């Protein structure tokens, strides 16, 4: 039976790692001093030698006599080498460490390949002492030592051969893996005591040793787990480690679409019938004494049918666990630690996530972090707002920022209405300023290549109103309507830039139904005209140009569409605003009774034709329509930057 997966949550391990880190800082020094004391106070044990002591063998090699060295290497390479033999050799090498120069690189490599981790505690302690002595005396071997340690951050491979043919190559399910990993981290800290610059040399090795993303989820989980542990006692590496982990997560994320994941789950459900559902209902016992086979069955409902989604889910769950464990101390959010982690993650977000189109799940690490305190959510929104309104940013970045703003405002249950209103005010005022700048220009026509950020901001506003209109109108309906009327949607919708033509049809349909119901603006006439203009217009039948009046569609995706990863969504669901089907049905009924002049076929399009399978906006994905986006370096007529440090309407508040 396979050993249980390493804590999908870092709980025990981050706790173990944190305690190991703290204990390393408290007891690690005394342990290492004790090892040194043992070394200096106890002479090497008597052992069988071929040609003398290790020191004599090394000195002979310097004189050109290589036979004894070859005998020594052969003995060290013996697969049946015993614990006592290893201890005796290590004691000898520690006493000869000053002679182990670069000339003996091959010998050192053999020593580093010794199977020391699964040996007795005496072997482990002696080997750790040897590593400390070696790197302190011969820093040239620092990289090989670090590389050896990093290679043990994944389960060893077990190869079964029959007739000289490999018939099995899988992870070794060793129950001692946690203890092995603990020893590896202890080794890193011992080496760092002797060579303080170790973290600087370690990071490139961690990048190099990262398993290929198509490796098993267990291999990936173990390696990422150990990387995150390293960030606890090497805080200077945290940002680089998190960037490495998120970069690998992103590669997995963009390689499998939400639709692929859902199709695989549906196919698996059809194959299994009702069996999995029954097991999921009754396997609720969490008793630690449960039989391992039954325990594995209990975990089965969390497994993703798509192999790439399974890897992504395991790793994202690990990252979310890490974020929570770093930020939450004794059950409460530690403001300072969360601030520091936020700074690291927002820089990674800017570098990796914001320029990446159509990632479905990785970005939820920011969503989750921002849920800890309102101040972090507001800081994130203001950060995105600055990206959107800055004309010096590439249009594609500004559009992505708008997508994130709209999706975050719509989906984050922890964002209060006052913050939603503040953001709507900022966005709508910016849209009106943009239109004012276009009134005197020569490019006031519908073209996504020219006005991409404008259309993305429009869509963010429409999307937010669709999700939040009930809250905006709840309580005092009159005041709510007055607020929505003050946004002057009519000017935006009726402008020459014609955002209803560019924005995603699903969003436009819902927005039109809401604004029509409350008589804010009547969109259907414009939508009907836009639908007619989508037809090609033939200018000449005698070799003339064929003119297609439709412009390129907006390259849209909503970053915080529902998470479909089974483990990770347990972190997200409690703080996530789902789309209420009742709202769609209510608007659908209202639309049927009020929209007379639009063609009849559009009635079905409101929830069926243009809205995905779930009949809600939640299904909007990057694959909703073909993309022909052209992104200029900046859009024309952008309003001046509104943000003034210390005077922004959206304050970045980090609450105590």
Curated annotation (Swiss-Prot):
It comes from the Eukaryota. Residues 555-650 are annotated as: Interaction with EIF3L. Signal peptide: none annotated. GO terms for molecular function: RNA polymerase binding; RNA polymerase I core promoter sequence-specific DNA binding; RNA polymerase I general transcription initiation factor activity. Transmembrane segments: none annotated. One of its GO terms (biological process) is DNA-templated transcription initiation. Residues 631-641 have a biased composition (Low complexity). The modification Phosphoserine is found at residues 168, 170, 638. InterPro entries: ARM-type_fold, RNA_pol_I_trans_ini_fac_RRN3. It is found in: Nucleus, Nucleolus. Residues 613-630 have a biased composition (Polar residues). Residues 265-304, 608-641 are annotated as: Disordered. The modification Phosphothreonine is found at residue 198. Keywords: Nucleus, Phosphoprotein, Transcription, Transcription regulation. Residues 498-650 are annotated as: Interaction with POLR1F. Pfam families: RRN3. GO terms for cellular component: nucleolus. Phosphorylated at Thr-198 by MAPK9/JNK2, which abrogates initiation complex formation. Part of Pol I pre-initiation complex (PIC), in which Pol I core assembles with RRN3 and promoter-bound UTBF and SL1/TIF-IB complex. Interacts with POLR1F, EIF3L, TAF1B and TAF1C. Required for efficient transcription initiation by RNA polymerase I. Required for the formation of the competent pre-initiation complex (PIC). Belongs to the RRN3 family. This is RNA polymerase I-specific transcription initiation factor RRN3. It comes from Mus musculus (Mouse).
């Amino acid at each position: 039976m396979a050993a249980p997966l390493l804590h999908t949550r870092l709980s025990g391990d981050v706790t173990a790692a944190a305690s190991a880190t703290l204990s390393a800082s408290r007891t690690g020094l005394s342990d290492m001093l004790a090892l040194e004391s043992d070394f200096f106070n106890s002479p090497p044990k008597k052992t069988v030698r071929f040609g003398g002591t290790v020191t004599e063998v090394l000195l002979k090699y310097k004189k050109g006599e290589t036979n004894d060295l070859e005998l020594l290497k052969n003995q060290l390479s013996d697969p049946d080498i015993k614990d006592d033999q290893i201890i005796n050799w290590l004691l000898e090498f520690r006493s000869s460490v000053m002679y182990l120069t670069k000339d003996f690189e091959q010998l050192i490599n053999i020593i580093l390949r010794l199977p020391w981790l699964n040996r007795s505690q005496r072997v482990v302690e002696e080997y750790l002492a040897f590593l400390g002595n070696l790197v302190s005396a011969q820093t040239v071997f620092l990289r090989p030592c670090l590389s050896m340690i990093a290679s043990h951050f994944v389960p060893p491979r077990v190869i079964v051969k029959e007739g000289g043919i490999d018939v099995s190559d899988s992870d070794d399910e060793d129950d001692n893996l946690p203890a092995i990993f603990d020893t590896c981290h202890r080794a890193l800290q011992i080496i760092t005591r002797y060579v303080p610059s170790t973290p600087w040399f370690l990071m490139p090795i961690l990048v190099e040793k990262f398993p290929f993303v198509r490796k098993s989820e267990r291999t990936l989980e173990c390696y990422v787990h150990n990387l995150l542990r390293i960030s606890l006692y090497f805080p200077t590496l945290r940002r680089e480690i998190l960037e490495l982990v998120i970069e690998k997560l992103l590669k997995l994320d963009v390689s499998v679409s939400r639709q692929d994941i859902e199709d695989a789950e549906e196919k698996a459900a059809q194959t299994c019938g009702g069996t999995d559902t029954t097991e999921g209902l009754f396997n609720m016992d969490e008793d630690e004494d449960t039989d391992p086979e039954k325990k594995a069955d209990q975990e089965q409902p969390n497994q993703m049918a798509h192999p790439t989604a399974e890897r992504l889910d395991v790793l994202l769950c690990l990252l979310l666990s890490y974020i929570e464990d770093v930020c939450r101390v004794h059950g409460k959010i530690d403001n300072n630690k969360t601030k520091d982690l936020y700074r690291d993650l927002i820089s990674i977000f800017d570098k990796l996530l914001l320029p990446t189109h159509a990632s479905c799940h990785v970005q939820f690490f920011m969503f989750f972090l921002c849920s800890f305190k309102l101040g972090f959510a507001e800081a994130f929104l203001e950060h995105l707002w600055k990206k959107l309104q800055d004309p010096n940013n590439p249009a594609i970045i500004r559009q992505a920022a708008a997508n994130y703003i709209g999706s975050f405002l719509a989906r984050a249950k922890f964002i209060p209405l006052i913050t939603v209103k503040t953001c709507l005010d900022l966005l709508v005022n910016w849209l009106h300023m943009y239109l004012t700048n276009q009134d005197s220009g020569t490019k006031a026509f519908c073209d996504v290549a020219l006005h991409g950020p404008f259309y993305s901001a429009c869509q963010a506003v429409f999307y937010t109103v669709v999700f939040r209109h009930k809250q905006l109108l709840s309580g005092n309906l009159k005041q709510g309507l007055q607020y929505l009327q003050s946004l002057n949607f009519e000017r935006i919708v009726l402008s020459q830039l014609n955002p209803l033509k560019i924005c995603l049809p699903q969003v436009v349909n819902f927005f039109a139904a809401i604004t029509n119901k409350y008589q804010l603006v009547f969109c259907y006439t414009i939508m009907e005209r836009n639908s007619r203009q989508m037809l090609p217009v033939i200018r000449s039948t005698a070799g003339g140009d064929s003119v297609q009046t439709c412009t390129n569609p907006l390259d849209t995706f909503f970053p915080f569409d529902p998470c479909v990863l089974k483990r990770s969504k347990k972190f997200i669901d409690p703080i996530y605003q789902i789309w209420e089907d009742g709202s769609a049905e209510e608007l659908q009924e209202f639309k049927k009774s009020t929209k007379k002049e639009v063609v009849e076929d559009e009635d079905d399009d409101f929830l069926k034709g243009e809205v995905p399978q779930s009949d809600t906006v939640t299904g909007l994905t990057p694959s909703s329509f073909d993309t022909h986006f052209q992104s200029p370096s900046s859009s024309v007529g952008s309003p001046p930057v509104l943000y003034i440090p210390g005077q922004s309407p959206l304050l970045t508040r980090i609450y105590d």
